[in-house]
Amino acid sequence: MEPFIGTWKMEKSEGFDKIMERLGVDYFTRKMGNMMKPNLIISDLGDGRYNMRSESKFKTSEFSFKLGEQFKEVTPDSREVMSMLTVEDGVLKQEQVGKDKTTYIDRVVYGNELRATVKADELVCVRTYSRGM
């Protein structure tokens, strides 16, 4: 988890609107989501617990987790899902199981860049962050 710990600033997002639409997110929330460039803050809380916080001018959301343990999460677009995060071969993998859809998010760090690849059905979104100061 060490490479993921820190503050990350979103630089670009490709394909996010299509993912949100597929997940049933309403038009207004999708438009707001596309305008936001949130900071992602990943913290080590100790005892194997971590916190992930997404902060923007419009909305802040966060959750705490232990790797390999399922938990309830309310996503930034207000969907209730069961989530689980694991690390495999340097990839922070997250599975979000919702009522109708399952979403997969793979986060990988390349130097000072974090790339999050979001998949829902055949749709793919890539969100790129740079390490903050």
Curated annotation (Swiss-Prot):
This is Fatty acid-binding protein homolog 2. It comes from Echinococcus granulosus. InterPro entries: Calycin, Fatty_acid-bd, ILBP, Lipocln_cytosolic_FA-bd_dom. CDD domains: FABP (cd00742). Pfam families: Lipocalin. GO terms for molecular function: lipid binding. It comes from the Eukaryota. May play a role in the acquisition, storage, and transport of lipids, and may be important to the organism since it is incapable of synthesizing most of its lipids de novo. A fatty acid binds at R107, R127, T128, Y129. Forms a beta-barrel structure that accommodates hydrophobic ligands in its interior.
